[in-house]
From Swiss-Prot:
Keywords: Biotin biosynthesis, Pyridoxal phosphate, Transferase. It comes from Burkholderia pseudomallei (strain 1710b). The gene is bioF. HAMAP family: BioF_aminotrans_2. This is 8-amino-7-oxononanoate synthase. Its EC number is 2.3.1.47. PANTHER family: 8-AMINO-7-OXONONANOATE SYNTHASE (PTHR13693:SF100), CLASS II AMINOTRANSFERASE/8-AMINO-7-OXONONANOATE SYNTHASE (PTHR13693). Pyridoxal 5'-phosphate binds at residues 112-113, 183, 211, 239. The lineage of its organism: Bacteria, Pseudomonadati, Pseudomonadota, Betaproteobacteria, Burkholderiales. GO terms for molecular function: 8-amino-7-oxononanoate synthase activity; pyridoxal phosphate binding. Substrate binds at residues 21, 137, 358.
Length: 394
């Protein structure tokens, strides 16, 4: 078959299963109220949990960073691209999120995907065993695959099953890998148990706090701080394009671990550093996150989460047991989920349909993503509209 025809057939198969993904075009800044594809909508799609993506303080820091450093870094971090802005940000991130370690150090990455690949491929390799939660993010799954380690998938959130697998493993290097807040269900991993298991079995514990950083814990310091957890075995990955409202990611761990990543993590070494202006904006974001304003935004987000759960129960949906900003509505089939999304979209509400392979087959869902930028009036609009997709999805 012609190579192009093979792809065309593959796309036709995707269409037949109701799995084609489509991009929508935003004409305005990320926020609760946006213009998307030329229409005014209320967005429940972004991960801008604190509503900082268009914050004037961050925008000005970004602009000032560009005026000072220019538009690009010019090279990789190890070949001329590591600016004072990057170095300052890493020090700030280590101080902000490294309370679990006696000697924390941070390493900044352009994306969360690259950060997870770096941590897993540098710490594991042939002869190692990675124990990965069944619902981990794709970047953790790919990092485990690329590491060439043996990979064992343990049932979602099941610390007892993980313990049994660790006891049966005699690999010299073991890594437990888990999201903290799971991005499609909104539930939280049993972090205290995972830390205890890592220490008992002499394993690294790599946690991806993409959806907890900035939101959970005192001053938004993340899921580990929320639980008061400390361990030299911890490797913490945080994302800066969600609650922080900018872009990039970071790894915080003991300084020896970070130096190892600098020397061995290919997704850090062999790529151009992010523009310094991005680091400047993230530094400004950290200041807001840790401030009284950050506390107020987290409190408002918490109230929105509570109200949303009440709305879902009142409108006869069966909400997943999530007390985070991710509120999924599991529908089941791809077609019914797409119909539900379209019904909401017709009423000016953007609530994306999440389908396989992002979630397991038969669990397609609407994913309501809440932000401190939302108002209770926005939730009232959502409440009034939720009756329509029930009929469409039935």
């Amino acid at each position: 078959m012609n190579p192009l025809a093979t792809l065309e057939q593959g796309l036709a198969d995707i269409d037949a299963q109701g799995l084609r993904r489509c991009r929508r075009v935003a004409d305005t800044a990320c926020g609760a109220h946006m213009t998307v594809d030329g229409r005014a909508i209320i967005g429940f799609a972004s991960n801008d949990y604190l509503g900082l993506a268009a914050h004037p303080r961050l925008v000005e820091a970004f602009a000032e960073g560009a005026r000072r450093y220019g538009s690009g870094s010019g090279g990789s971090h190890l070949l001329g691209g590591h600016s004072r802005a990057h170095a300052t940000l890493e020090d700030q991130l280590a101080a902000f999120s490294g309370g679990f370690s006696d000697a924390p150090r941070a390493l900044y990455f352009s994306t969360g995907y690259m950060a997870n690949l770096a941590a897993l491929t540098a710490l594991a390799g042939r002869g190692a065993t990675i124990f990965s939660d069944a619902l981990n993010h794709a970047s953790l799954i790919d990092g485990a695959r690329l590491s060439r380690a043996n990979v064992q998938i343990y049932p979602h959130g099941d610390a007892d099953a993980l313990d049994a697998r660790l006891r049966a493993c005699d690999a010299p290097t073991k890594l437990i890998v888990s999201d903290t807040v799971f991005s499609m269900d909104g539930d939280v991993a049993p972090l205290a148990r995972l830390v205890a298991l890592a220490e008992t079995h002499g394993a690294w514990l790599v946690v991806d706090d993409a959806h907890g950083f900035g939101v959970l814990g005192p001053q938004g310091r993340g899921a580990l701080a929320a639980h008061g957890l400390r361990s030299p075995n911890l490797v913490y990955v945080g994302t800066l394009g969600k609650a922080a409202g900018v872009a990039g990611a970071f790894v915080v761990a003991h300084e020896t671990v970070i130096e190892w990543l600098v020397q061995r993590a290919r997704s850090y070494i062999f790529t151009t550093a992010a523009p310094p202006s991005v680091a400047c904006a993230v530094s400004a974001s950290l200041a807001v996150i840790a401030s009284d304003e950050g506390d107020a935004r987290r409190a408002h987000l918490g109230a929105l989460i509570k109200r949303t759960r009440a709305i879902l129960r009142a409108t006869h949906w069966q909400p997943v047991d999530s007390h985070t900003a991710v509120q999924p509505l599991v529908i089941g089939s791809n077609e019914a989920t797409l119909a539900a999304m379209a019904a909401l979209d017709a009423q000016g509400l953007w609530v994306p349909a999440i389908r396989p392979p992002t979630v397991p087959a038969g669990t397609s869902r609407l994913r309501i993503s809440l932000s401190a930028a939302h108002s209770f009036d926005d939730l009232a609009r959502l409440e009034a509209a939720l009756v329509t997709p029930i009929g469409a999805a039935a």
